């Protein structure tokens, strides 16, 4: 049996480090992963995958990645259950074994600065075209 997950996506929120009562570091984040195909209206849809990152890896993720960071994740699927209000609930998440940042800090800063830019500013008039 083999349980391996490899994903590329963007963090949907700033990761926050939590320390458990046993002094272990952990962060739980969500990764937005585009589907390989477009919907009927021509738009890409995304799945939002829960990640759990432990220890030094969690500390590194919190230090170097932020909301919108493009990362590659290598891990495994885990299902856990918990009781709430007399009901058993199941949660499936990815336990992260490693990750890689796929954009530099400069690229991230440029993306964040351009996020609010109006597309009208990017349209060139016909006289401005070089050909």
Where does each model-flagged region fall?
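OB-fold and OB-like beta-barrel modules that bind single-stranded nucleic acids
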Residues: 9-13, 31, 67-78, 96-99
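Core FKBP-type peptidyl-prolyl cis-trans isomerase
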Residues: 4-46, 90
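Beta-strand/loop nucleic-acid-binding surfaces
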Residues: 47-55
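Acidic, gly/ser/pro-rich intrinsically disordered tails
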Residues: 1-2, 19-22, 42-44, 87, ...
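Short coil/turn motifs at secondary-structure junctions
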Residues: 14-16, 34-38, 56, 80-82, ...
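Residue-level recognition of specific faces of alpha-helices
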Residues: 4, 28-30, 50, 60, ...
